[in-house]
Curated annotation (Swiss-Prot):
May be essential for the survival of the neurosensory epithelium of the inner ear. This is Otospiralin. It comes from Mus musculus (Mouse). One of its GO terms (biological process) is sensory perception of sound. Coiled coil: none annotated. The gene is Otos. It is found in: Secreted. Residues 1-21 form the signal peptide. Keywords: Secreted, Signal. One of its GO terms (cellular component) is extracellular region. InterPro entries: Otospiralin.
Amino acid sequence: MQACVLWWLALGMLLGIPAGAKPMPEEADPHTQPPAMPYWPFSTSDFWNYVQYFQTQGAYPQIEDMARTFFAHFPLGSTLGFHVPYQED
């Protein structure tokens, strides 16, 4: 009885390994939209005052989030992962 169970277990392992089952890669959804550009209603000096305040508090993750929001309004915003609309000079 044990030999039969071991034989079926070995056969199952030998046949299961070469099957080569791989997970299907997930395709990107063509209907997804890029993230919306965040809104920064304050001035540049307000931004730097907030940076200095957060530095005194040691709140560096908040500085990164705020900087991402602030700099998304400039042409380099597309490098931050935001779609920046074309702006005429």
